A protein has these predicted regions:
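Bacterial N-terminal signal peptides that target proteins for export
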Residues: 2-16
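Predominantly soluble domains enriched in secretory-pathway, periplasmic, or organellar proteins
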Residues: 18-20, 24-374
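A general, composition-driven signal for non-globular sequence regions
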Residues: 1, 5-6, 21, 39, ...
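Polar helix-capping/helix-linker motif
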Residues: 6-7, 25, 373, 502
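Periplasmic c-type cytochrome electron-transfer domains
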Residues: 205-232, 236-239, 243-622
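Prokaryotic Sec-type signal peptides and long signal-anchor helices
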Residues: 9, 20-22, 604
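Intrinsically disordered and other compositionally biased segments
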Residues: 10-13, 23, 412
Length: 622
């Protein structure tokens, strides 16, 4: 029969078959298609891993799973991406407000691009000509020309933008908000929002997402923060959300609960997801319960994911990537400082790679492991850890209905120098949180053997090495300088500073000293608390109306404000939430004066406080 076909026809049939095979083959891997703490080069030869605690990026040869080099990049690197099909890297250095371009083969710095603040996720176009970087604060996408190494466009992305991914055709960017899990699609050419998938009011902590290369689906992990449920079996839940990118009505977004997904195994704190090259497998890492889940992606628009298998990965897994040949899945255990190489078929171990040495003291390291753990002895029912509400020491952007009343989650920055702790100053040492560990919220066994001293009573410090380690980690967080004062205080901020320190406004009578707080760890009968008129508007309040004075440093990024979170802007602190001038005398201020005062507050800190001068040692009580 073949004799009846001409050579031209045979060539056409051959070309058709080649095209058909290519269309049915796994989607070609593109390095940097979604943000992560890890990335794999397009040719599958190198892996790069961002080490947040070490301030480094480690380059690994995937031919033999050996470390080639560890490159110093700066404070708290987050996202890392190979640039196009090259072996050059882009690193989002979160703590230094820059994107660093480095050569993976020799570790040399190619260039650095300064950005406004907090670069988190970074992805590269397939041709390597452009980088797109999310700025956690103030919620922007920065486009960078890799040839000139300069920013060429800034796109407003929504508050606290973290996760970022390129669509399969390279025409869209998908971005997720950290505190809402809202996903937006941006048309790259115009920079405008092309589509949006909102999360529910309880969705929280969505830091990364991936796009299916073959199906119109996006996948992101997040938690639900149910602020009206202050107990360990109802407040925090793990999810994977699956937005449908096809046009249509309704939410076009499904949620897959992870606490019942793995054959009834409760998990906590999903951190990242990874997808294989042909879009048929999804991998999820859980930083609280130290697990890796593997799931089949279903083409059913209903279940979306079907559990395949799981393993215990290691301490605090934060990243997962799949090799371009779909043979190996890599998991980054952040607090083991290791990357695991696992077979995709059965998740058996191929190699364990030490990517950095532990840069933390042994005490802080142990405390950090406990802080992120949703396992005994910290937690009894696995759903929650300290980091569920205080990720990396930052607030979760929520106001919780706690037993004592409404409480807005506070930052840990500077906490070592601003004791006592809590809005009500009801804990004078971090070790007092043994009561939280054993209480309804965490339902853990606890870290002290035997009885616990009451809060504000005798010290719990020294009763447990683990509890002291937890305190050491909690007290290790420092401030970042405000991006609003990088060039010094603006004229408006200077005018606001004059108002703030004026005798008439009276702000500095409470917000004093290097940390702008009069909070001190005194004996219970001498604790300094103030009634600022905000403690009588909630019928559930049990401990007001006087509250501890919070530091104002870093205030620009910790909204909503006040103990009950009812000030949605800083201006509202002085307008809607300052009855009878009890929280500073501001009723006489004009609108432009309030604006200047806000500019000053946003500029804090414009220099680092001096803790040696400010620190007050804890009062020893009998």
């Amino acid at each position: 029969m073949l004799s009846h076909f001409s050579r031209a026809t045979l060539r056409s049939v051959s070309l058709f078959l080649v095209t058909l095979v290519a269309a049915c083959s796994p989607h070609a891997a593109q390095a940097g298609a979604s943000n992560s703490l890890m990335d794999i080069s397009a040719d599958g030869k190198l892996l790069a891993c961002s080490n947040r605690d070490s301030g480094t990026v480690t380059v690994v040869s995937l031919a033999n799973h050996k470390v080639l080099r560890e490159i110093q990049v700066g404070k708290h690197p987050e996202g890392v991406s190979f640039i196009g099909d090259s072996h050059n890297l882009a690193v989002a250095v979160y703590g230094e407000d820059k994107v660093l371009l480095v050569s993976a083969p020799d570790g040399g710095v190619i260039g650095a691009v300064d950005v406004f603040d907090e670069p988190y996720g970074v992805v590269s176009t397939a041709d390597g000509s452009r980088l797109f970087v999310t700025l956690d604060y103030p919620g922007q996408i920065v486009e960078i020309d890799t040839k000139t190494r300069k920013p060429i466009r800034t796109i407003e992305a929504g508050p606290f933008a973290r996760g970022i991914a390129l669509g399969p055709k390279g025409e869209r960017l998908y971005v997720t908000e950290f505190y809402t899990s809202t996903v937006r699609a941006f048309d790259i050419e115009s920079g405008k929002v092309a589509d949006e998938w909102k999360g529910s009011s309880t969705d929280n902590l969505a830091r990364q997402l991936v796009v299916n290369p073959r199906r119109p689906k996006v996948y992101l992990s997040h938690i639900r923060s149910r602020v009206n449920e202050a107990h360990g079996s109802g407040s925090i839940f793990p999810y994977v959300a699956v937005p449908d990118t096809r046009p249509g009505e309704g939410s076009r977004r499904r949620r897959v609960p992870m606490d019942t997904f793995g054959q009834g195994r409760i998990t906590a704190n999903p951190w990242e997801v990874g997808i294989n090259p042909d879009g048929t497998q999804l991998y999820i890492v859980f930083a609280g319960t130290n697990e890796l889940f593997a799931a089949n992606i279903e083409d059913d628009d209903y279940r979306e994911l079907v559990f395949r298998r799981m393993i215990i990965a290691g301490n605090n897994p934060r990243a997962v990537r799949v090799s371009p040949d779909d043979q190996t899945v890599y998991v980054y255990n952040a607090l083991d400082f290791q990357v695991l190489a696992l077979k995709t078929s059965d998740l058996s171990n191929v190699a364990t790679i030490d990517v950095t040495t532990n840069p933390l003291t042994s005490e802080v390291h142990r405390g950090k492991i406990l802080f992120y753990s949703a396992l005994p002895p910290m937690v009894g029912r696995r759903w929650i850890s300290c980091s569920s509400c205080h990720p990396d020491g930052q607030p979760d952007g929520r106001t919780w209905k706690n037993p004592e009343g409404l409480r807005n989650t506070q930052s840990f920055a500077g906490m070592a120098y601003t004791h006592p702790v809590h809005w009500s100053a009801d804990r004078d040492e971090v070790q007092d949180f043994e009561h939280t560990i054993r209480g309804p919220l965490m339902q853990g066994q606890g870290l002290i053997r035997g009885a616990v001293n009451p809060p504000l009573g005798k010290l719990n410090k020294g009763l447990s090495a683990d509890l002291d380690a937890l305190a050491a980690y909690a007290d290790s967080h420092d401030f970042s300088l405000s991006p609003h004062s990088k060039g010094g205080l603006s004229d408006a901020a200077k005018r606001g500073r004059t108002i703030f320190f004026s005798e008439k406004a009276n702000c500095a009578s409470c917000h004093s000293g290097p940390f702008l707080t009069d909070s001190k760890p005194l004996s219970p009968d001498k604790l300094i608390r103030h009634d600022v008129g905000t403690g009588n508007d909630d019928p559930g309040e049990k401990m007001g109306p006087a509250y501890d004075t919070p530091t104002l440093l870093g205030l620009y990024r910790t909204g909503p404000w006040l103990h009950h979170g009812k000030a949605t802007t800083l201006a509202e602190v002085f307008t809607k939430n300052n009855p009878n001038d009890k929280h500073g005398v501001t009723s006489h201020l004009k609108e432009n004066d309030i604006s200047d005062l806000v500019e000053f507050l946003k500029a804090l800190p414009y220099e680092q406080p001096v803790p040696d001068v400010a620190r007050v040692s804890k009062v020893e009580k009998k």
